[in-house]
Each structure stands twice: as structure tokens, then as C-alpha cells.
């Protein structure tokens, strides 16, 4: 991933003449990383693309108000996280399915980027059964090895709540895998 000079980007964002080009750089640098963060929650390429597009639209609309109190990626991730949750809530309301049906429909579908063995596939199936927020916490902690404090900053939840959520997710995943063996 290419690096950007955040101070330079902040200056250019404030100038209407250079705002569009600065935003294009932000999109180019962070879109792939955001895609995979969103994909952890969506578990579907098309939905991930929709949420990613909504994330950048919302970021563009709020760009001139971004003051740099957090890193650009943290700001974008927070938007993406909220957009993901909104999307999942709307999808659940539109389809009006109960939780058991949702779990069945959310089963992991291997895509072209996934070529793991049976254990990895079982893990991904188990992860896909978790509620969206819990799945995101688990993925950031387990797959990305993020510290609880960093996850807390990204999702706006206390460290204690994150630890509890992660612990419950691990229990659910363990039980899921044991039931399939």
C-alpha cells in the first residue's frame, strides 16, 4: 500500500481547487484495504462493492469537515463500519428473515481469493455465522492481530466490551467447528 502525506492531504482538502485530486489519492491508497475490511462483514463481493461506494460517497460529502483529529484511514474505516452495519440492518429488514434463516443464508461461499483447506473453510463458515459487529471484532483481533485499544478507536466500543465480544465469538466458533467434526 502506498503511503500518503496526511498533512499535505489535509491542506489540499481545505482548498476547493485541489480537493478532488486529494480525494482521488485517498481513494487510490485506501480502497483495497477498506474493501477487505468491509468484506469481513458482508461476506459477499457485490454487497462489499456497494458499501465501499457508499463509504466513499459519504466521505466525499464530509471531506471539507474532516479536520485530521484522527488518521485518514481511521476516519474512513469508521464510515465504512457504520455503512456496513446500516446495510446489514436494511438487508435484514427487507428480507424479513429470522436469525436462524439468516445464519443459513450467511454460510461462507468460497470466492476466487480463497483456497484454504477444510479447517480454514470451517473457520470461515463459523465466522460467517457471527453477528456483524462480533464478526468484525473477531476478524480484526484474530486475522489482523490488532490490539483491543486500536479496535476500540476504530469501532467506538469500550475495550471491556470488545474483550467480551471476542471471547463469545471464540466460544461460538469453537462450538460450530466441534459440531461439524
PLM region descriptions:
Residues 2-7, 86, 93-120:
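Internal acidic/polar
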Residues 85, 134, 153-180:
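DNA-recognition helix of helix-turn-helix
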Residues 1-32, 150, 179:
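N-terminal module of bacterial RNA polymerase sigma factors
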Residues 40-43, 54-71, 90-92:
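Sigma70-family region 2
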Residues 137-141:
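A short pre-motif secondary-structure segment
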